[in-house]
Amino acid sequence: MHSQIWVVSTLLISIVLIVLTIVKFKFHPFLALLLASFFVGTMMGMGPLDMVNAIESGIGGTLGFLAAVIGLGTILGKMMEVSGAAERIGLTLQRCRWLSVDVIMVLVGLICGITLFVEVGVVLLIPLAFSIAKKTNTSLLKLAIPLCTALMAVHCVVPPHPAALYVANKLGADIGSVIVYGLLVGLMASLIGGPLFLKFLGQRLPFKPVPTEFADLKVRDEKTLPSLGATLFTILLPIALMLVKTIAELNMARESGLYILVEFIGNPITAMFIAVFVAYYVLGIRQHMSMGTMLTHTENGFGSIANILLIIGAGGAFNAILKSSSLADTLAVILSNMHMHPILLAWLVALILHAAVGSATVAMMGATAIVAPMLPLYPDISPEIIAIAIGSGAIGCTIVTDSLFWLVKQYCGATLNETFKYYTTATFIASVVALAGTFLLSFII
């Protein structure tokens, strides 16, 4: 049995190893996580074959569920992108004269972000911000910051986004419940971290016009876009199916045939599978796309997820090593003796890891590995709440280590100092608000 000092030192060194190899030596996170897994296994006295078996089972067990859902989600997001469905939502909300432009951008980010990776969402939706900025003579920062904050919030707390789905799966949380809680917390965090924060700044927020190099980026002709009803139906269908499953689990007899049917169609894999074929028809065939064209778009979409799948698989390996080496059990005892609330601990670990590594996905996987062992010691706190707490932490501290920081800086034509002052601060405020929302939810449910 290893001493607590040895266990804590091993864990801390493994985290430092991950950060250094990614930030300093430019290792891919997949390799960094695998290296840390071998390091922990060796330091905890695992045999070579035991380490390999744990890594293999960790990768397989994690991707066995997530690979299918992420793949199907990628198709759904790609169809949203190529059909112009995301722009349809933005243009429709733009007509709501009772909403301010910054609130509109939050809603666009939240709704469209459900099916889009955060970086893809920024690239796809920023022309809408450009268009509104030109028409209303508004500072681009007032539009881009709420949009990007909302996209980041959804990315971290709402499945079927890969990191949020990974955390929910590893903690044994109900995915439908996490979706509902995540949307509530994400909306509150985005509105306060975006529009309310910018309103507080007032005239101190500098005016930023659309950068000249992006002046030619335009929103597509509205006549070529799918209808709003078709767009919303496609986005919300898989979420609705998963929520029906959650409701059924609370209210239906488990022996009934209807319950089995609802469990089947509400499973994330089945729900996303159904949604993909609805998207093919509603956003593809009805928009005069051929099956060959949709096949090409699907293949192009799959090319972009190899990176995230490998990172998530390696995160599963790291998690498996922590469990197999008994480090997780000892860590649970140590953390419980710290007398720090598990919600605060989950948030803080994810926040620090995001700042250090620059990837919200890696941060959430690392936080899950650290926090999960102590959950059995707190039966009154649901895994859904801890999942939201981890995601809330990962929203914050979007700094120079994160590619999203540079994307926002480039599109807004902002200086490094301005991006720190306005966007990094916005994400940190959103993260703190999300933490407060998570605590509030924990008292209610």
UniProtKB/Swiss-Prot annotation:
Q: Which InterPro entries match?
A: Glcn_transporter (IPR003474)
Keywords, ordered alphabetically: Amino-acid transport, Cell inner membrane, Cell membrane, Membrane, Transmembrane, Transmembrane helix, Transport
Superkingdom of source: Bacteria
What residue ranges lie in the Cytoplasmic compartment?
1-4, 50-56, 127-139, 199-223, 279-301, 406-424
Q: Which GO cellular component terms, listed alphabetically, does the Swiss-Prot or TrEMBL entry include?
A: plasma membrane
A Gene Ontology molecular function term for this protein is: gluconate transmembrane transporter activity
* Induction info: By growth in D-serine, controlled by DsdC.
Transmembrane parts of this sequence: 5-25, 29-49, 57-77, 106-126, 140-160, 178-198, 224-244, 258-278, 302-322, 343-363, 364-384, 385-405, 425-445
* Periplasmic side, ranges: 26-28, 78-105, 161-177, 245-257, 323-342
| Predominant subcellular localization, coarse grouping | membrane
Q: How does it sit in the membrane?
A: Multi-pass membrane protein
Among the record's GO biological process terms, what is one?
Answer: D-serine transmembrane transport
Entry's localization field = Cell inner membrane
Q: Which NCBIfam families match?
A: gntP, PRK09921.1
Q: Record's family?
A: Belongs to the GntP permease family.
Please give the PANTHER family that the UniProt record associates with this protein.
D-SERINE TRANSPORTER DSDX, GNT FAMILY GLUCONATE TRANSPORTER
- Function, please? A D-serine-specific transporter, may function as a H(+) symporter.
Protein name, per record: D-serine transporter DsdX
- Provenance organism: Escherichia coli (strain K12)
Its lineage opens with: Bacteria, Pseudomonadati, Pseudomonadota, Gammaproteobacteria, Enterobacterales
